[in-house]
Amino acid sequence: MPNIKSAKKRVRVTRKKTLRNKHVKTMVKTAIKKFELALQNEDVETAREELKNATKTIDKAVSKGVIHKNNAARKKSRLTAKFNNIAS
């Protein structure tokens, strides 16, 4: 446990930011899982909609600084490639 006042504040701030970041990351993972479930069911229209939602969620995470833009680009690229395999 920190003794210095600024260190105590850093612990509080870090705890708050960790919770916020965890929430956003969970939303991204959930969106990706929904998309992959639609792919498994081979429902192209639902998969297209879930891909759109997943991409939107990933972009929001980037804008909030939770994930790096290159990480987001890689995730979106892989999801799009999976969709294109099933759609064609």
Swiss-Prot record:
Single GO molecular function: small ribosomal subunit rRNA binding
- Species per Swiss-Prot/TrEMBL record: Natranaerobius thermophilus (strain ATCC BAA-1301 / DSM 18059 / JW/NM-WN-LF)
Q: Which InterPro entries does the UniProt entry name for this protein?
A: Ribosomal_bS20, Ribosomal_bS20_sf
Function of this protein?
Answer: Binds directly to 16S ribosomal RNA.
Instruction: Supply the name of the protein.
Output: Small ribosomal subunit protein bS20
Supply one GO CC term from the record: cytosol
UniProt keyword list: Ribonucleoprotein, Ribosomal protein, RNA-binding, rRNA-binding
What Pfam families does the record point to?
A: Ribosomal_S20p (PF01649)
Is rRNA-binding set as a keyword in this record? yes
Please indicate if the UniProt record lists RNA-binding as a keyword.
yes
- Please report which protein family the annotation says this sequence is part of: Belongs to the bacterial ribosomal protein bS20 family.
Output one GO BP term. translation
